[in-house]
Amino acid sequence: MKILITDSLLRKTFDLVNILLKNFDEEAIIFSSDHSLNKIEKIYNTKNIYLLRNNFFDSDLKIISERYKNESIIYFPVEENTTIHFYKFLIKYGDENFKYLLPSFESFNLSRNKNDLNVFCENNEIPCPKYYSKQNIYNKKFDYPLILKPKIGSGSEGIKFIKSKSELIINKIDFKNYFIQELLDNPRDIKAGFFMCKEGQIISFYSHQRIRTFPEQGGVSVYSKSDLNHEIKLAGKDIIKKLNWSGFMMIEYLQDVSTNKFKLIEINPRLWGSILLSEFINANFISLYISLCLDQQISPNVVKSDKFIRWIFPFDIIHFFKNPENPLKFFKIKDDTCYVNFTYSNPMKSFRFIFFTYFNYKKLKQKLFNG
């Protein structure tokens, strides 16, 4: 068996590889990327690297498949765009020797388009923020406040809050790429549920609460606490069944303060940035995914609550300098906390990853040696 790692220079991929190396030999891992293969070699000290270019995806993946034709190759859905290429490969060539756990292509595309997902939820009576169509907006059939979002994207990029008539300039809204929802009273109190599924059934679950984000308003999670929120699990059960979902799924919710219902905000249909927490709390989504791909028997795990995950470099460090406090307390290493790009790694390997991915190596080299 081999394990194909795409998008090998991402921080979540680095954590994925370190988790895999707890349970598998280095020879089992195939690294791939559409660029910077030399960086991958330096970070992971490996030669088992292949080009997987967007413009030549099918032919590049064929090379990998043929190279290991006598073995099964596990595919991990690291990034959405890469996974779309993988779906198209499967449609054209069939499974070949690849093993994977994915929903239908239609369900995958629906999940990543926030506009289509919102309409789907409303049509299927799944609680979600109220959706306003372009016609609703032009006919003034809506109530303030509103939120304008990109149809496809993750995080807070492109999001705009519209709280009054003066902030709504209809003729400047790109309705092809953006859509409008009601703005709930607590737009930043997002809770996340993490699911491993097979054919519409939840195999394993955990959730987390955000403690700190960067930037503070609408930013990425840099400090979170694990829990087992059964209301979120119950809320996710319906859409997972309706989409007949298989594989990884992260669902973000906001709790409507007027009804106390959890409303679905968005779905991430691939590996998420805090996947490290899954291993740390014994949810073990990575090994579970592989077992499900291979139709192996699985045993239930006791998932731990009240554990933490921190993304120290660079964003928690930036937060510290913007909000100074006792450094010994802020940076204290704790046993109940896992650290993005450090836990399950070693200091030298983590340093190499940070150096080759966060810094421009060529420019730094020129400054050091060319004055």
Describe each model-derived feature in a short phrase.
Residues 1-101, 369:
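ATP-binding N-terminal substructure of ATP-dependent carboxylate-amine bond-forming enzymes
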Residues 37-45, 88, 138-143, 169-174:
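Short loop/helix-cap segments at secondary-structure boundaries that form the rim of catalytic
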Residues 91-163:
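A conserved helix-loop-beta module that forms one wall/lid of the active-site cleft
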Residues 127-129, 145-147, 157-187, 215-219, ...:
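Conserved ATP-binding module of the ATP-grasp superfamily
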Residues 146, 203, 261-266:
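Protein kinase-like catalytic core scaffold
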Residues 182-244, 268-293:
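ATP-dependent carboxylate/phosphate-activation module, predominantly the ATP-grasp catalytic core
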Residues 246-257:
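A short glycine-rich, hydrophobically flanked beta-strand micro-motif that places a catalytic Asp/Glu
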Residues 291-371:
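Peripheral (often C-terminal) accessory segments that flank ATP-dependent C-N-forming ligase machineries
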